Curated annotation (Swiss-Prot):
Organism: Eggplant mosaic virus
Protein name stated in the entry: 70 kDa protein
Lineage top rank: taxon: Viruses
Positions with biased composition (Low complexity): 524-533, 540-550
Composition-biased stretches (Polar residues): 268-279, 504-515
Length: 649
């Protein structure tokens, strides 16, 4: 029964294949089945020509294949050695075929064939993918890794030379592939699109930017012989005064340079009393010395334009004043200034000095060589008219009888304490203990020399007897308050008269008052006593009449009236106890040079009461306000005694 065997064999094979294909997916999903996970057929493959169906159902198999021949002996022969390659169509075995073909291409020759040798099949570079194509002949499809396909190579020597034409790359389905590869050596302009141009942060940029390649240019060698390549020295550069003029050619006529070595002019005298002491200007000092140069100039007013570029000076000779050999050549530039000569009709350039080293110091800021001409006169601004200068007499014009009086002065080391309160009266200060006599001079218009000499015993007697007449004091008051003032148009004669008047007053007071202890007047901060060894200061200036002179006269009168109207004065020390201190104060210089009062006290001292006469007669009683102020001053003096020098210090 051969048909039965064949049917059995067929049914067994079909059942095996059916059983294998039905359970292969579930076993593969679990992964832990004791059965075979890969559905491999155990039947001999020599007689099974039909490929297994993709679906495991037997009814879906293709029925065009003929059944196998009946062979009962081979149908049950299950050989363990079977081929792994299944008998399927090339479309289903593409992965296996790819593996075999790749292994074969490893030993192929590395040389790339020419373009004309490549395959020109029309279906090679098709736009559609392979899984969408439907061809009747599937064996004609070539995989990407086949041996006849161009593969990548690192050997660039095998590449052929391509023309430098900029033709676009040919599309697929073209027969010619000559210009397939583009030249990579030539630069090309690229159009880059800036994606940030649409953002609001960059509203001004254009969307397209043209990037150009730099043109190839050889590196140029620097030409050191070019005239612009030479560095400019310091002497050729323009300084503070501008660029220097060109060097003078001795063949051409030049201008006469004014020398700055002339002696300085004498300073202008501020008062006519010092005109005799100053040297008279001579004709040589008025006209500056002129040093002759090479030749006279035909056009002295023309100067070269300093803004034009200087020409080359290699063919010219040396400058007019050659510098010393030790000077640096870069610092041989002369400064040119205009001299302020009153006799010159035009300005002429002149050199400061011939030595370039000294000239360099002047350019660098040397104090003695700043570059100013010698005929410049320094003039100080005049002082304000409100000041009262102190006129100190010259040493040669002081008379001899004034020396003993000044030698007996004692300014002591007692500072004058002042205490200004907030009370409304006119004068508020603390009266010090009366030191020795003092002589000083004040010059508002002319010369007003005042000397005070009061006897302490007479002052004590007048303080005890307030109703006693004071003829001597009245005489002195009259002589002090009615000093004759010279006219302002003759200051020199006024000075002589004032010095003679001061000499007479000092002689009369020396004879009448043997005791040297006299109260001096109050000295303001700008009034200093005339000491025998002091030098006269600068020459005082004549001032116009001002109300300050009237206030000074009022102050002097009030000082004398206060001595007359005060009924009680502080007790004066005995001559024996005060002799040693007065002798030391007369012989030794003062330790504290007479402290001046503050400005607020001066304003109170030199301010006159409105509505009062600035020149009151000696017999006229003082005003009521002034009497109250002096009485308050006396009470404050009695309440606060004067301390010694050690206590004050």
């Amino acid at each position: 029964m051969p048909h039965g065997l064949s049917v059995c064999s067929r049914s067994s094979q079909l059942n095996y294949s059916q059983r294998c294909f039905y359970k292969s997916n579930s076993e593969l999903r679990r992964g832990t089945s004791p059965r075979l996970s890969i559905p491999i057929s155990l039947a001999p493959s020599q007689r099974s020509r039909s490929p297994p169906s993709i679906l495991g159902h037997p009814e879906l198999r293709p029925r065009s294949h003929s059944p196998p021949p009946p062979n009962p002996q081979n149908s049950r022969d299950f050989s363990p050695v079977q081929s792994l390659a299944c008998s399927r169509s090339p479309a289903f075995n593409c992965d296996v075929h790819e593996t075999v073909q790749v292994s074969k291409t490893c030993g192929s020759k590395p040389k790339i064939p020419r373009v004309d040798q490549l395959s020109t099949h029309c279906r090679r570079h098709h736009s559609l993918p392979l899984h969408l194509t439907h061809f009747s002949k599937q064996f004609n499809l070539l995989h990407a890794r086949c041996s006849d396909v161009l593969f990548s190579s690192s050997d660039r020597r095998s590449l052929h030379s391509v023309s430098r034409t900029r033709d676009p790359v040919l599309q697929s389905h073209s027969a010619s592939r000559v210009s397939f590869h583009r030249s990579l050596s030539l630069p090309r302009d690229l159009h880059l699109q800036d994606l940030r141009s649409d953002s609001p942060l960059h509203p001004g940029e254009s969307p397209l930017r043209l990037v150009q390649s730099a043109p190839p240019s050889p590196i140029l060698a620097e030409d050191f012989l070019h005239p612009l390549a030479f560095p400019r020295f310091v002497c050729d550069q323009a300084g503070i005064l501008g660029p220097s003029p060109l060097h003078i050619d001795p063949a051409r006529p030049t201008t006469k340079a004014l020398s700055l070595c002339t002696p300085p002019r004498p300073a202008k005298s501020t008062s006519p009393c010092n005109n005799s002491q100053l040297p008279k200007p001579t004709a040589a000092s008025d006209k500056p010395a002129i040093l002759p140069t090479a030749a006279a100039s035909t056009q002295p007013g023309l100067l070269p334009n300093s803004r034009l570029r200087r020409t080359a000076t290699s063919h010219l000779s040396a400058p007019t004043s050659p510098p010393p050999a030790s000077a640096n050549k870069r610092l041989q530039r002369s400064l040119h200034l205009h001299s302020r000569s009153p006799h010159s009709s035009h300005f002429r350039p002149s050199r400061i000095c011939a030595n370039s080293k000294q000239q360099t110091r002047a350019r660098l800021g040397h104090s003695k060589r700043v570059g100013q001409s010698a005929d410049l006169v320094c003039q100080c601004p005049p002082p304000p008219p409100s000041m009262l200068p102190l006129l100190l007499l010259p040493r040669g014009k002081v008379k001899a009888p004034l020396r003993p009086t000044l030698a007996s002065l004692s300014f002591g080391s007692h500072p004058i304490p002042y205490h200004v309160t907030s009370s409304p009266p006119l004068i508020q200060f603390q009266h010090p203990f009366p030191p020795p006599s003092a002589t000083f001079s004040v010059s508002p218009l002319g010369v007003l020399t005042t000397a005070f000499a009061l006897n302490p015993t007479q002052s004590a007697e007048r303080s005890c007897d307030p109703e006693s007449p004071t003829p001597t004091l009245g005489h002195k008051t009259t002589s002090l308050s009615r000093l004759p003032l010279p006219p302002p148009h003759s200051p020199h004669s006024a000075q002589d008269r004032a010095s003679a008047l001061a000499t007479d007053v000092s002689n009369s007071e020396t004879k009448n008052c043997p005791s040297p202890t006299v109260p001096p007047p109050f000295l303001p901060n700008h009034l200093h006593p005339l000491l025998p060894g002091t030098d006269p200061p600068t020459t005082p200036r004549q001032l116009s009449p001002s109300p300050s002179s009237l206030s000074l006269r009022t102050f002097l009168d009030s000082a004398v009236i206060s001595c007359d109207s005060s009924p009680v004065l502080p007790p004066s020390p005995s001559p024996s106890s005060h002799s040693s201190s007065s002798f030391q104060s007369c012989t030794s210089p003062p330790r504290f040079p007479c402290y001046p009062p503050p400005p607020s006290a001066l304003d109170l001292l030199f301010s006159s009461t409105p509505g009062t006469d600035p020149f009151p007669p000696p017999d006229t009683p003082p005003p009521h306000k002034r009497t109250i102020a002096l009485e308050r001053l006396r009470l404050r003096q009695c309440a606060t005694p004067f301390h010694s020098c050690d206590d004050v210090c």
